[in-house]
């Protein structure tokens, strides 16, 4: 799948600013007893990334999380969050 992501841009220190964006992939419909997601790597696949002449990705990492929410403290949900 190919995803598009939009992040809030803060340009206080333009043109020397750095932005941080996150993309969280997971399910709220099915818990970890039904759906297990595992990243292939902690580095996202950027093969379909479209470069920009205005900025570059300096670093990209991903982490898997086992999360519980206030509504359902005994139910665990998995997600993978990538930070750019």
Swiss-Prot record:
SUPFAM superfamilies documented for this protein:
Nicotinic receptor ligand binding domain-like
Q: According to its UniProt record, where is this protein located?
A: Postsynaptic cell membrane; Cell membrane
Please indicate if the UniProt record lists DNA damage as a keyword: no
The source's domain of life comes to: Eukaryota
The record's keywords, sorted A to Z, are:
Cell membrane, Disulfide bond, Glycoprotein, Ion channel, Ion transport, Ligand-gated ion channel, Membrane, Postsynaptic cell membrane, Receptor, Synapse, Transmembrane, Transport
InterPro entries listed in its UniProt record: Neur_chan_lig-bd, Neur_chan_lig-bd_sf, Neur_channel, Neurotransmitter_ion_chnl_CS
Chain positions of site Confers toxin resistance: 66, 68, 73
Q: Which residues are glycosylated?
A: 20, 66
Membrane association type? Multi-pass membrane protein
Question: So what does this thing catalyse?
Answer: K(+)(in) = K(+)(out); Na(+)(in) = Na(+)(out)
What Gene3D superfamilies does the annotation carry? Answer: Neurotransmitter-gated ion-channel ligand-binding domain
Named from the GO MF annotations, one term is: transmembrane signaling receptor activity
Which cysteine residues pair off into disulfide bonds? 7-21, 71-72
Checking Pfam families in the record gives: Neur_chan_LBD
A Gene Ontology cellular-component term? postsynaptic membrane
Its job: Upon acetylcholine binding, the AChR responds by an extensive change in conformation that affects all subunits and leads to opening of an ion-conducting channel across the plasma membrane.
Which family does the record claim for this protein?
Belongs to the ligand-gated ion channel (TC 1.A.9) family. Acetylcholine receptor (TC 1.A.9.1) subfamily. Alpha-1/CHRNA1 sub-subfamily.
Tell me the subunit arrangement: One of the alpha chains that assemble within the acetylcholine receptor, a pentamer of two alpha chains, a beta, a delta, and a gamma (in immature muscle) or epsilon (in mature muscle) chains. The muscle heteropentamer composed of alpha-1, beta-1, delta, epsilon subunits interacts with the alpha-conotoxin ImII.
The molecule here is called: Acetylcholine receptor subunit alpha
